[in-house]
Amino acid sequence: MDSNIKKLLKEFYLIQCKGWVKNTGSGTSSAGTTLEHLFGKQEDALPLPDYLGIELKTKLITSKYEIRLFSAILDNKPDLMNKLWQLCSWKCTRNGGTRSLYDNFNALQYSNTHRKYAFKMHINYAKKCVELLLYNNWDKKKVNIDMSWSFRELEQRLKIKLSHMALVHAEKFVNKETKEEKFKFLDITIYKLKSFDVFLKLLEQGIISVELKMYPFKDTERQDKFRNRETTFCISQENLPLLFEEIDTSNYVIN
């Protein structure tokens, strides 16, 4: 891995030397997409690290969003994400009445929401899974849904995707006249994952949360398909040292 880290640091240094670069992405993740393009990586949805076994994460210096670690669907039975959608989604008036489902929740308490259903996690060591719990706010009672993520699947995703991670900070500039966006990539920090057991403990403590997003396509031809159909595990930048060890790269020679 040392040689891969050296290659990554060299490529990042060359990217830094470019200064401000044109945005080649779109949406809230455009800085990350632009960086991946500069590294020669094309967009994909594969659960694999981005570059030589190292996952790339990009964060704008002005962003307050948590870092999205990895995505994994509920897996104890088939088609659970669609079943969750059918049960919990609602009509969104600002999107022309199309249905949506989104929330952010952890293992400490049910998500604070005015909607019908609230979510929470429970780490079940006996069954080796992370259970999704559901509460009906209107009827004031828990709902039995039997949905969960297996330890096996979560550990596999975590270790393959995030054994090593690089966090890059970026600055954004928008030309007021042309609306053209550019990014400057400022610094890079390399991390090594501690363990899956640590991941589970941070879930229990509410330090790692889950972001749920399910949005269907707006056009009539694809209304039965989703732009997003995922649950993503997230952590704040401040809490990264709880899950990862920072790798000292000060002695790495770039040549």
Regions found by a protein language model. Give the residues of each.
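Nucleic-acid endonuclease domains
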Residues: 1-52, 58-255
